Amino acid sequence: MITQLEKDLQLMKMHNINAIRTSHYPNAPIFYKLCDRYGFYVIDEADLEMHGSVSVNNTAHWDWSDYSGIALVASNKMFYKGILDREKICLARDINRPCVIMWSMGNESGNGHNLTKAAEWIKAFDNTRLLHYESVHNQGDTTDAPYDVVSRMYPSPEDWSKFPENKKEKRPFILCEYCHAMGNGPGDLEDYHKVFHSSPRFCGGFMQLLMKSLICRLCLTACGTFQRLMPA
């Protein structure tokens, strides 16, 4: 019996989709077995996301001008063991899966000493795979960071096209998220794909999302009426 998951993977292959990022947590074990079978490249992402952990240093709210405002947990030593545990769980379970070509530290968790130490542990534990983390980029020059790719999410095609101009940076570039849209969109795929083909340094990207945004549900409101929702 073919499961819905397998049908989704078959559909992706039919449309020349060859890589999956398990945002933002490891997937069910059967997923990796199917990816082995169908030949998908997988970025296996640990269950680590800390959007709400703003620091109390004058950033009690989300501030796009200071992305480090969500870096309290990433920096405070009392959280290091918990962060490392989540990384270890991901690696220990999936290290023998051929489809996994890259580990991802997590998603949008700021950056700090805890993440750097955990990344160093991962590199020592498994030096056969690449390591990914997007949220390090707010720290300025990251050419000496323990990550094997330069990762971004949602830059404009114009800004993205300028990345190879940085002569200090020798790593490949990857869009870990782009073109997140619901309904009749997005309309900028061609612009991004032109950039992908403009330099061998661009590895491609991961659209957010494939199926989930198309699920509609009904829920009962406080007034007793039904309202159709489209969850992100």
Predicted regions and their residues:
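Extended substrate-binding grooves/exosites of carbohydrate-active enzymes
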Residues: 1-232
